[in-house]
Amino acid sequence: MHRFKPFLTAILALGLSGCTAMAGEGRSPATYANPVLDTDFPDPAVLKASDGFYYAYATQTGKGAATLNLQVARSRDLVEWKLLGDALPNKPVWARGTQDFWAPHVSEHAGRYYLYYSAKPDAALTDSARGLCLAVATAVRPEGPFTDIGRPLQCGTGFVNIDPMAFDDPETGKRLLYWGSGFGPIKVQELGPDRISFASGSKPVDLVHPAPSEDPAEYGRLIEGAWLVRRGGWYYLFYSGDNCCGPKAHYAAMVARSRSATGPFETRALPAGAPGNVVVGQRGIWVAPGHNSVIEDARGDHWIVYHAVDSRRPRSSEGDEVNTRRIMLIDRLVWRGGWPEVEGSGPSSGPRPRPVVR
């Protein structure tokens, strides 16, 4: 989830495209250090495109006098990233007057790119009962520009319809869409062959439910940001909770697993359907890490790509008490007993071996 309130909306600032963001210190040709993208880049979703580049997509942000609806960056190695600008430069016709464009995910099929995201419809400006919508846009290039299909995929109340992630299940051949928040469960539903609508007769299935707790070590009050990975006969559902932003941000990435892409899911410590099992949590200077994607490198290692807040510079600008500055980090996942972990259970600091890429 992202809460962004721009100070000024304008055309893209001159010179934005092609700029390289500063990243972690202490690197050598064989190492990297977090962050890999030291600019506000919330909810990062990474795609390895057929052109050989990695693309990262992120939630709306402000860059100087400009507002980027959905950000896109490109890399050859998952470490050095170049900001490319706005993947969705033109707002959809049903959300011209709003500013909430969140948590994109892009998939590639038959030479076409599908961008799934969430946005607040114009109707919500006059009707407080209206919440965010799931949406789809398409493009012929991974960097865009993406064009919305002209209608929401699904709308509802509050923040229920956010954080979509598309996944093609190799076992069943089904095209699936995961989403969810708003203090409700993570859901999945089958997409139709066109990938821009739900399959006829399909219904959403609840997968993992929030679990309110007074324990400050727990993160299950609100869960969001689904990402699915298949490995060794298991499907791993990553998700995050429970408060991404603000002075009291309290957030971590978690995981559950299942033998089926549509559940039931279990965690290491709790019964099926309950959240738990933190993969990466607060550590050192890094606060509120989460809302991750996962990408596999050329050696077969899995890397978790996520945002976190640098406690030394937590705000987007001086005097800004609204927008939390969430920057992009990566860490290698290690697998122990069939479960993924990050060494030290939190973001790394200092030099680490780079991902292996071709």
Language model: regions and residue ranges:
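Bacterial N-terminal signal peptides that target proteins for export
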Residues: 1-8
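Bacterial N-terminal signal peptides
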Residues: 9-18
